[in-house]
């Protein structure tokens, strides 16, 4: 949105910082014309490489903001996947897989390489990345920032960790034994502060296919509460 140059290839050379629309957007065209070579093609046997992957970098997982430090904490998914266009011959009228009123994804992404994660502290006023914590697994959970300058984040291997709000160095961790995809919350009772997080989540195949150590992970649903 800031109009700065970006790596890789996209359907547009950039975004208009005022409107948020592609700079080559034509309001009078019925169909927008993409940059040549930016769309998928059947000419590449391996498919078209997309970076970040279809689920990342930043997805729906909630970010958090520390107003005292002026930092935004963003959980990200690091990695790429491939999109391959395959000719579809069997459609509804031929008895194919597309059925009325049933969900159809049109295919699934190919993720031949392992996906990782990262936690970033960003100055939202300038876009400058102040700190980065590289993570072993993709981030599927949200972030919590506290007034005590701690940042909490759960991970796919069941690790629930606290990081320093300035450096993002890990300060504490505890493995709950089940994947974490929920954002933690904090509250106080009689002057005592607590942090709670729901655990237990579906193991997404595109993640565990290249992380075999996660295949035997339990997916029990539980609520964990920690005191500060």
Predicted regions, residues:
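Beta-sheet-rich non-transmembrane sensory/scaffold domains
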Residues: 1-228
């Amino acid at each position: 949105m800031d109009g700065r140059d970006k790596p890789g290839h996209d359907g547009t050379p950039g975004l208009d910082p005022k409107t948020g629309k592609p700079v080559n957007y034509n309001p009078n065209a019925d169909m927008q014309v993409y940059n040549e070579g930016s769309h998928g093609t059947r000419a590449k046997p391996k498919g078209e490489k997309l970076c970040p992957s279809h689920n990342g970098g930043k997805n729906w997982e909630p970010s958090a903001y520390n107003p005292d430090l002026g930092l935004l904490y963003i959980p990200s998914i690091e990695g790429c996947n491939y999109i391959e266009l395959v000719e579809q011959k069997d459609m509804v009228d031929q008895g194919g897989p597309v059925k009325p009123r049933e969900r159809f994804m049109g295919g699934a992404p190919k993720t031949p390489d392992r996906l990782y994660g990262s936690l970033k502290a960003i100055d939202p006023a300038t876009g400058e990345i102040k700190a980065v914590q590289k993570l072993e697994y993709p981030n599927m959970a949200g972030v919590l920032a506290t007034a005590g300058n701690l940042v909490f984040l759960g991970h796919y291997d069941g690790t629930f960790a606290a990081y320093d709000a300035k450096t993002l160095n890990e300060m504490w961790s505890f493995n709950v034994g089940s994947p974490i995809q929920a954002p933690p919350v904090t509250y106080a009772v009689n002057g005592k502060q607590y942090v709670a997080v729901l655990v237990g989540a579906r193991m997404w195949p595109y993640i565990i296919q290249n992380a075999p150590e996660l295949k035997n992970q339990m997916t029990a649903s539980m609520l964990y509460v920690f005191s500060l």
